[in-house]
From Swiss-Prot:
One of its GO terms (biological process) is cysteine biosynthetic process. Belongs to the CysZ family. InterPro entries: CysZ_sulfate_transptr (IPR050480), Sulfate_CysZ (IPR022985). It is found in: Cell inner membrane. It comes from Haemophilus influenzae (strain PittGG). This is Sulfate transporter CysZ. Keywords: Amino-acid biosynthesis, Cell inner membrane, Cell membrane, Cysteine biosynthesis, Membrane, Sulfate transport, Transmembrane, Transmembrane helix, Transport.
Length: 272
């Protein structure tokens, strides 16, 4: 069921992400994710251009002759599916490569919001955390990969693969974008992946709204170069205002998808 308050708050956190990347104390931590994002997007664009024609021909071969009158619509949906599959590839690589930098950016944003240090700032401490961050990215990949494979297999089914699959793929992409970027502040506090996933699922409309805006902006030229640090900043604000008090200092507590959070933001007035 659509929750209008969560819809509003998801939009709010995305907009606030743009505000934070302009803050003086955060700019130097924003630069590296932007550079990495630019390199990865250029590589993705080259791969997409070189493979899109053959990929479209392959998908259209599964459309029966009696549906040829819908070829334009089905072609559009097929292209959307291919775009989203390429997008999964991009987010997977970017997650592994940029994880240490995004984790550090999330730390700095949280410190700006709360005035409290999370971890030591020494280079040795940061390097010590890198294996844990990469293991977390691998955990996200293990969570998403079976679903991606299932969507890929469904795309072989005539009509279903060109109509329902694009919608499911888009919704799953929105969900994964919320998980991808919210995970950085959660992981900084060593909150487990399952607890994080269930917490986000408890406010699913907010998560899907935030993830949907991130997904859409990834396909907009120029804006997509900035979207990674924007999403990290917005997700960190979401963590501080929704989950930090409940999870950040009570890691041993079991958090199920049925648990309700009633967190009110003194800064924004948004009520969940």
């Amino acid at each position: 069921m659509l929750n209008l308050n969560e819809l509003k708050s998801g939009f709010h956190y995305f907009v606030m992400g743009w505000h934070f990347i302009t803050q003086k104390g955060l700019r130097r931590f924003v630069i590296m994710p932007i550079v990495l994002n630019t390199i990865l997007l250029c590589g993705l664009f080259w791969l997409f251009i070189s493979q899109i024609s053959s990929a479209i021909d392959w998908m259209m071969n599964f459309i029966p002759d009696w549906l040829s009158f819908l070829s334009v619509i089905l072609l559009t949906l097929s292209i959307l599916t291919i775009l989203l599959l390429f997008y999964f590839t991009f987010t997977t690589f970017s997650g592994f490569i940029a994880a240490p930098f995004n984790g550090l950016l999330a730390e700095k944003v949280e410190k700006m919001l709360t005035g409290e240090n999370i971890n030591d700032d020494g280079l040795v401490d940061i390097m010590r955390d890198v294996p844990r961050m990469l293991a977390r990215e691998w955990q996200k990949l293990r969570y998403s990969l079976p679903k991606i494979i299932a969507l890929f297999l469904l795309s072989f089914i005539p009509l279903v693969g060109q109509t329902i699959v694009p919608v499911l793929t888009f919704l799953f992409t929105c969900w994964m974008m919320a998980i991808q970027y919210c995970d950085y502040p959660f992981d900084n506090h060593k909150v487990s992946f399952d607890i994080m996933k269930n917490a986000l699922g408890n406010q699913r409309t907010q998560s899907l709204t935030f993830g949907g805006l991130v997904t859409c902006c990834t396909f907009v030229p120029v804006i997509n170069l900035l979207i990674m640090p924007v999403a990290v900043c917005g997700a960190t604000l979401m963590w501080v205002e929704n989950y930090r008090n409940d999870l950040g200092f009570n890691m041993n507590r079991s958090f199920s998808s049925q648990t309700g959070l009633d967190v009110r933001s003194e800064n924004t007035g948004i009520v969940k």
